[in-house]
Amino acid sequence: MRTPDFSAIWQASKQLTARIILLAFATFALYVFHDLAFPQGAAAYPFWAQQTAPETPREATGRIVCANCHLAQKPAEVEIPQSVLPDTVFEAVVKIPYDLDSQQVLGDGSKGGLNVGAVLMLPEGFKIAPEDRIPEEMKEKIEGLYFQPYREDQENVVIVGPLPGDQYQEIVFPVLSPDPATNKSIEFGKYSVHLGANRGRGQVYPTGELSNNNAFKASKAGTVTEISQTEEGGYSVTVTTSEGDVVETIPPGPELIVTKGQQVAAGDALTNNPNVGGFGQKDTEVVLQSPGRIKGLMVFLAGIMLAQILLVIKKKQVERVQAAEMNF
């Protein structure tokens, strides 16, 4: 185990109270209803992971399942104290950076701002702090957020989102550490923390169907002989091959980059790639520190300091005796 970070321990020891804000379920329900009723508009946000992997969001390989729908890789960070004391509340700060000037393709083909979402896998026994335990200062940081357990019996795995990205590039999770004195299944030591965070819409729905947030490609080699616009605002591209005509249907959103009469090979892009978002994953660690160990260490350090002081005093006494003998 690493040497304790005393600044982090001291900070954690001052956080004696904590709480989580329970807010507008109706607002969250509105988000959920919108995404279920119009899935093209906000695909593959954290709760979609619950459908594709209901047991755990982390695969055996260590990959978070959100990466199955968000194919582009983007950075994500999580900042937590190096060590925490039992039964204390601390902040886990998730950072989801992106260019705020970016505009993503929405389900209807129009452009709009990016949303963000995250899944935070805490160690067993750690959970979102109840409202009455959250300090007022921290409560201000989590105002407007709704944290949901990944499963009803899995409080240590938490999801949040979708949220407007221009307001929530940083998301604060108020986390309550467990107490081994009351929970015998928990032990002091070092534990892993896993984060998965996305910004923007995904490229694949949980059903495996592609969203319109993709670059669409030719399935066969041939010549583009016809391009027509569909009623929905997309395109129908006819490619004449040696085996006949192949019609490629492109939903609204991506921009065509081919023209009539152009030769294309199988796999060539017919459109640009409109995706400006992506998924990021980050792993870190936290130490659940024993107060007894800290006290013992403090006593040990105090003993060393006392021994040094006594040695200095003893040295002075010896020097006085030697000086007296020389004068005699």
Swiss-Prot record:
GO cellular component: a single term: plasma membrane-derived thylakoid membrane
Location(s) in or outside the cell: Cellular thylakoid membrane
Gene Ontology molecular function, alphabetical: electron transfer activity; heme binding; iron ion binding
Gene3D superfamilies per record: 2.40.50.100, Cytochrome f large domain (2.60.40.830), Single helix bin (1.20.5.700)
Membrane topology: Single-pass membrane protein
Entry note: cofactor: Binds 1 heme group covalently.
Transmembrane segments: 294-314
Signal peptide bounds: 1-44
Domain of life: Bacteria
Function: Component of the cytochrome b6-f complex, which mediates electron transfer between photosystem II (PSII) and photosystem I (PSI), cyclic electron flow around PSI, and state transitions.
Entry protein name: Cytochrome f
